[in-house]
A protein has these predicted regions:
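Conserved adenylation A10 loop of the ANL superfamily
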Residues: 1
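Short acidic amphipathic segments
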Residues: 240-246
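Gly/Ser/Thr-rich phosphate-binding loop
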Residues: 69-73, 81-151
Length: 246
């Protein structure tokens, strides 16, 4: 259960230096918290023009039609666009960017899954910033986000101003004004997820001294070897995912 305050705080608690009246092309499902909060509510708060993409099949056409400055994406979309950029690596970067996104385009916000840092470097060559974040629906949804010029490799950004975090037995706990009230009519599940206002994310990770969040895997996915060592399969999957053969 997310309240009006939960969503409003998540959308407005951080000044991300997004120019007012930016044009946003919304390509993710609006019923998902990520799109609802960061495309729609954040866009409203900044006076942005929000253009709704009617189908992923039409995304390229709609980019040319609406000429957005900003888009929210999930890593799978970014990987697909990266192939176009890589295929045109021998052409002038400005020309490729203008053909794929338009000269006015400058920022992609990424969330929902792991993003290979190499893609961030690739898009930078074409004058496009990828700002990665981390969150979950139970947190309305953003927990941390990257700011332009303040990226740390392998990090999923800095904690939102209305959020604090701690690590308990390797698991990341978060607390703040964006954390849900509970699961609707599911008291046992709510009790399991929340402890004195702290939400158990189920993610393994830590926060460094500057407030940057790092994720190392999912608690439920841990593989315990015969000698008692904990192995996170996500590290292996992410490494394999960099191979063009996979």
């Amino acid at each position: 259960m997310l309240t009006h305050r939960n969503l409003a705080e998540n959308a407005t608690c951080l000044d991300m230096n997004i120019p007012e009246k930016s044009v946003v092309l919304s390509v993710l499902p609006i019923h998902h918290a990520y799109c609802l909060c960061m495309d729609i509510l954040k866009g409203f708060s900044l006076g942005s023009t929000i253009c709704i993409n009617d189908s992923l099949i039409h995304m390229a056409k709609n980019i040319k039609l609406f000429q957005p400055n900003i888009m929210l994406m999930v890593p799978l979309m970014i990987e697909s666009l990266a192939k176009k950029l890589q295929a045109a690596k021998d052409l002038p970067a400005e020309l490729v960017k203008e053909n794929v996104f338009g000269a006015q385009f400058h920022t992609i916000f990424s969330g929902g899954a792991y993003l290979n840092p190499d893609y961030i470097t690739l898009f930078e060559r074409f004058g496009i910033s990828i700002l990665q974040g981390y969150g979950m629906t139970e947190c309305s949804p953003v927990i941390s986000t990257t700011m332009a010029g303040k990226q740390k490799k392998q990090s999923v950004g800095m904690l939102m101003p209305n959020c604090e975090a701690k690590t308990v037995d390797g698991e990341l706990y978060v607390r703040g004004s964006s954390v849900m009230q509970g699961y609707y009519k599911m008291p046992e599940e709510t009790k399991e997820a929340l402890s004195d206002g702290w939400l158990k994310t189920g993610d393994l990770g830590y926060v460094d001294e500057e407030g940057y969040v790092y994720l190392t895997g999912r608690k439920k996915n841990l593989i315990i070897t015969k000698n008692g060592e904990n192995v996170s399969p996500e590290e292996i999957e992410n490494k394999l995912g960099t191979s063009p053969l996979v």
